[in-house]
């Protein structure tokens, strides 16, 4: 991991970058220069603040609004990052760990939502943290409230402060909800969670706060996002996803003017209200064909907020607001603040339900191109180094699947499935369209023999099992001849005492559950 973090490098600078000197109309910003790594951007750069101050430039007046260029507000794959490394490091990343994760239960029974395993080797929290590190944002807080022990352990092992070249100033730190004389309640929502730690966030010498969710699957260059925020002189910039009419009814939609400024919000609109939220998405960079297919934009719950604006909104303007999306952001618009939309036109999935989690994981097995790839060397996804041996497959038939590290797979068939760390799968098993999360530890041969002698079941998948459309959480002990096929096509069922739940027709075996031999689910 140390080598991986040390290999982080800045994206090449575009020839079209604006080597702009902030004039008298630029708001106050800090002159402290930060360092993260020895890598640097080639070509034109934004002028460091210290250089401007030495030339007598003042920073106490707001700049007049700018006309928005589509290139400045979209995450086009043709555009290139042109922020100076110091500029992106003047941003504090704040990742919201989410609520209790009731819709993801039982996966959240013993862990916070961002700690849920993903893609055989990773956890959900690795996505926003890796996006930050790949964007040269090295100061990151993760706010949690429920079951944060495993999340804290993972982050401390994966992103230790003495690793890589960001050791001098970078960190990834968990902030759990706490009670104090000023705030006797737990987090009441996204905005309230940030408000309760404003005293800590404002100590950091940064220009903006980057607010992220801990349960989304996507790959995004935040440097472009931040650059768009600064070039448009926005108070708040909201990441927006283009939507067709079919999906739009499930999201909070936004309406923009010809400059890309947000002027209206609507939460899951229907009928005439939905039609009224149509926008010309060519303003944000889509071509004419895509704009006709995607005439709506939905908030991704990702924001860049200028530091002074955040302090003003949460402390003074809306001291009782609990949520960013439904209260603070619309409130800022009503106050006349400049709230800009930034188009992200790529794969994005909100991992909020069992079905979404299942589909997102199996999506990485899709041919010829997966929904989300962990193989992008220009923007890798980091995780905890475990130093496990390669997976061993003995007479196994494995197709269209992803296999994690340290697995032992014997004479079985696996198709269109994801198999997690340290999975042990015995002879004769057939696994289709399923997600196995693996195990936290190995049992020795002696321990497995002793369990078998006592009539108990070792960790892993027993002989001659059949799984279809199932999720098996970590450390599950499943005996021989077990069938998990949802034979009665049940859509919803809670069988916690029996070790499993069914949601959206997907059978989910609970972590540490014991399923005796011969059981049919």
Swiss-Prot record:
| Chief localisation class | plastid
This enzyme catalyses: alpha-D-glucose 1-phosphate + ATP + H(+) = ADP-alpha-D-glucose + diphosphate
Keyword Phosphoprotein among record annotations: no
Q: Give the record's GO CC terms.
A: chloroplast
Q: Which Pfam family would be a valid example here? A: NTP_transferase
Keywords attached to this entry: Allosteric enzyme, ATP-binding, Chloroplast, Nucleotide-binding, Nucleotidyltransferase, Plastid, Starch biosynthesis, Transferase, Transit peptide
Q: What is this protein called?
A: Glucose-1-phosphate adenylyltransferase small subunit, chloroplastic
State the taxonomy lineage: Eukaryota, Viridiplantae, Streptophyta, Embryophyta, Tracheophyta
């Amino acid at each position: 991991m140390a080598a991986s973090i040390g290999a982080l490098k800045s994206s090449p600078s575009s020839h079209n970058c604006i080597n702009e000197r902030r004039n008298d109309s630029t708001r106050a910003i800090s002159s402290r220069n930060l360092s993260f790594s020895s890598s640097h951007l080639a070509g034109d750069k934004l002028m460091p603040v210290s250089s401007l101050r030495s030339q007598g430039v003042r920073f106490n007046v707001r700049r007049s609004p700018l006309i928005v260029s589509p290139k400045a507000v979209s995450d086009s794959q043709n555009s290139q990052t042109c922020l100076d490394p110091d500029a992106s490091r003047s941003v504090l990343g704040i990742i919201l760990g989410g609520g209790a994760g009731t819709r993801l239960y039982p996966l959240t029974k013993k862990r916070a939502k961002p700690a849920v395993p993903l893609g055989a080797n990773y956890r959900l929290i690795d996505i926003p943290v890796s996006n930050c590190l790949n964007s040269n944002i090295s100061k990151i807080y993760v706010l949690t409230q429920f079951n944060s022990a495993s999340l804290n352990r993972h982050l401390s092992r994966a992103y230790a402060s003495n690793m890589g070249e960001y050791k001098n100033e970078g960190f990834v730190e968990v902030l759990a909800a706490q009670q104090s004389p000023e705030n006797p309640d737990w987090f009441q929502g996204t905005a309230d969670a940030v408000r309760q730690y404003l005293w800590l966030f404002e100590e950091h010498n940064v220009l903006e706060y980057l607010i992220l969710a801990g349960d989304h699957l996507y790959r995004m260059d935040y440097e472009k996002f931040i650059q768009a925020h600064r070039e448009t002189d926005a108070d708040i910039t909201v990441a927006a996803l283009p939507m067709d009419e079919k999906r739009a009814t499930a999201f909070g939609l936004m309406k923009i003017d010809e400059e890309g400024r947000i002027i209206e919000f609507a939460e899951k609109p229907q009928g005439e209200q939905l039609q009224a939220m149509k926008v010309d998405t060519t303003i944000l960079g889509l071509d004419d064909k895509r704009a006709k297919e995607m005439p709506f934009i939905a908030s991704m719950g990702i924001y860049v907020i200028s530091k002074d604006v955040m302090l003003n909104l949460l402390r003074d303007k809306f001291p009782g607001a609990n949520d960013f999306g439904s209260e603070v952001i619309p409130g800022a618009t009503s106050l006349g603040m400049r709230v800009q939309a930034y188009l992200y036109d790529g794969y994005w999935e909100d991992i909020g339900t069992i079905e979404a989690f299942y589909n997102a994981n199996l999506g990485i097995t899709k041919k010829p191109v997966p929904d989300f790839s962990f193989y992008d060397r220009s923007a890798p996804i980091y995780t905890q180094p475990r130093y496990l041996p390669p997976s061993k497959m003995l007479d196994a038939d494995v197709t269209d699947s992803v296999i994690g590290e340290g697995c032992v797979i014997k004479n079985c068939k696996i198709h269109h499935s994801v198999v997690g760390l340290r999975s042990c799968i015995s002879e004769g098993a057939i696994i289709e369209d399923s997600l196995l999360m693996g195990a936290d530890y190995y049992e020795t041969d002696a321990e497995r023999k002793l369990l078998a002698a006592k009539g108990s079941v070792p960790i892993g998948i027993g002989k001659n099992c059949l799984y279809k459309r199932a999720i098996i959480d970590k450390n599950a002990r499943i005996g021989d001849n077990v069938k998990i096929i949802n034979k009665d096509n049940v859509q919803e069922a809670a069988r916690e005492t029996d070790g499993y739940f069914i949601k959206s027709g997907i059978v989910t075996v609970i972590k540490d559950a014991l399923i005796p031999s011969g059981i049919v689910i």
